[in-house]
Amino acid sequence: MKRLLTIIINCSLLIINSSAQEPLSLQRAYDMAQQNYPLIKQRDLIKQTTGYTVDNLSKGFLPQISFSGQATYQSEVTGVKIPIPGISIASVNKDQYKFLTDINQTVYDGGIIKSQKELQSLNAEMEQQKVEVELYKLKERINQLFLGVLFLDEQMKQVDLVKTDLNNGIKRVEAQVDNGVAFKSNLNVLKAELLKADQRIIELESSRKGLIDVLSLFINQNLPENTKLETPQAIAPGIAAEIQRPELKLYSTQQKMLGGQFKLIDSRNKPKAGIFLQGGYGKPGLNLLKNEFAFFYTTGVRLNWSFGGLYTQKNEKKIIEVSQKTVDIQKEVFLLNTNTQLKQQLSELDKLQKLIASDGEIIDLRIKVKDAAKAQLENGVITANDYLREVNAEDQARQSLITHQVQLLQAQINYQTISGKQ
């Protein structure tokens, strides 16, 4: 019994916790959508690839060891034909054997490995930034879903107000019908309109559920139908917004990477130095006059400087300069388009603020007209249709206000998103 009581208490607490769920904020929706977007997995893959590549490049300074062997038969060999008294020089066999081990150690590579490692790091940064650009685009989708739900919530509140007015009208007309001063058809008109309002609620709830379901997919969390969304704080945009979009960092990284390619070209055309050791076993050895198997080795310093790259160095750098100019053009186009969008949003904000101010005045007037119609309905001066017309007129005025308020909030959020501050 005690155990059963504990289970019941825990279940009750679970129900209370679920019902007291905190409203979902727009920023939290952003974060959850980005964390659960499949593309986010590419971040770790880029890090792993970069780590492996840089590690491989670092091994370029490790000793390079190779083994080789050969057995040959020559049609002719070097021999000493001049007779020397008291000395007999044997001829070298035509079949010869050689097994070699070569060890090469790079001492100076002109900075190639360093440049390649820097390039690889910049390439990883560029790929990561491409991911950030794609993730940022998610915000536009989340904005649409989030504000769509808020818009539907406001519409449902307005329908509830209409239902209140209709119920008040129904009570008055019912009293009139009971007293024989109104026709029942007037009552039926209001009841039919009340049923239409209930249908409107069903439509709005269904649309809201659809948006919540899609939002659940994006954030990878099962949101209940009655999930509350926190209305974002309206932020007035500045006169000159500083653009902080991830695309700008991408362009900057691309320029750094092209600059790294300049360094790599210079490094490839510098001299290289290293030490080497070659050891072997063969017949003959280094002493060609000794016709037998022997161990031998050779060691020393090697300097290599190839001038072939100097022929193409100038054109290779010009190609990079063209690429840098292309990136600059892409950046200019992006900034132009972004600033154009910001100007459009500012114009939209100004228009909506004026419309909202006008909506308030219209609603005040419509309320006065509706209240007067309510009194006239109660006194039997007008019919239910006349009263219903004024109720619908106020409803339309409030719907316009709701639409403009949500559009204003959307324009403010869009402004922040476009500028990169959201």
Model-found features: residue ranges?
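Membrane-embedded beta-strand positions in outer-membrane beta-barrel channels/transporters
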Residues: 30, 100-102, 146, 298-302, ...
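Acidic, low-complexity, intrinsically disordered peripheral segments
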Residues: 30, 223, 400-422
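Small/polar (Gly/Ser/Thr/Ala-rich) solvent-exposed segments
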Residues: 41, 64-83, 90-93, 104-133, ...
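Periplasmic alpha-helical coiled-coil/stalk elements that build and connect Gram-negative outer-membrane
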Residues: 52, 134-249, 348, 352, ...
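Transmembrane beta-barrel architecture of outer-membrane proteins
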Residues: 96-98, 144, 189, 272, ...
